[in-house]
């Protein structure tokens, strides 16, 4: 079957068996359908922008979160109806959903996105006091309020255990990028049919890249291996890399990762020494690093903290932060090697001399 005719519903039902050999369980399909419905509502709210009764971006972001909360209640009610008496209080899956990542971009009509992660609930992981309480805890966004141990337990395990992950990017077109462990696939929202259509099957990230996304304003707080890597990229053809790189920063996590999935690149949000909390990293392990790392790896890329594979890290708390470096495999491998060399004390000390050796013949001007 040609992928141009495949909707998200048909994809999850197994109609694209050339892309996914295993049909996802019915309960997981239900979660992903509700995620799709939620992001459609969020996309509609964002498209109105400031045409409502407020001229502030905060109201747009608040409306998007409220739209998700409405879907969340419906999803919990559906889970309760489908749950037998013996299974009461035992949801099969739990969803971590960041409904509006980087909401400040709405103020400038910039790109925003949603990120989600789905974990299977272990049989021994649910011991809630009652079915009603558990039903309310079955699904929810971890960034809005604290959750108790019965809810969060499924997320306190390595990211490689995710059942599904994805993000939505709200741009000129609304796209849903999703993985269920068999490749990373992109769906575009058709404005006429209101259906997500499979437009980017089996996304692959090029192994080599010349584009780096990093906030260079934090350079003075970086660890030496990160500074070493970025400076080598800046030196371009005149340096040891012997080729030019393009550095950029948009302060939009989903947009940066989407660009990498579409055309390759490297994203760096390393730990730094600006604050005590930043030394542990700046991105959420549960609903930023883990789902995005899953998507990138399934597309042939790599994701690391600098010292550890992201999907091997098990967060200890719901709100744990971690550094994130992801993208084209060759560059992630290189920066991982720089971290190992630094930790072993075998890397060349990083220097930034005031005066460099110069020549009348510069490599970057040669033909």
UniProtKB/Swiss-Prot annotation:
Gene3D superfamilies reported for this sequence: 3.40.190.80, Fructose-1,6-Bisphosphatase, subunit A, domain 1
Gene expressing this chain: fbp3
Keyword Magnesium annotated: no
Compartments, record wording: Cytoplasm
Name the UniProt record assigns to this protein: Fructose-1,6-bisphosphatase class 1 3
Metabolic or biological pathway, per its Swiss-Prot or TrEMBL entry: Carbohydrate biosynthesis; gluconeogenesis
GO molecular function: fructose 1,6-bisphosphate 1-phosphatase activity
InterPro entries referenced in this protein's UniProt entry, alphabetically: FBPase_C_dom, FBPase_class-1, FBPase_N, FBPtase
EC nos: 3.1.3.11
A GO BP annotation: gluconeogenesis
UniProt family annotation: Belongs to the FBPase class 1 family.
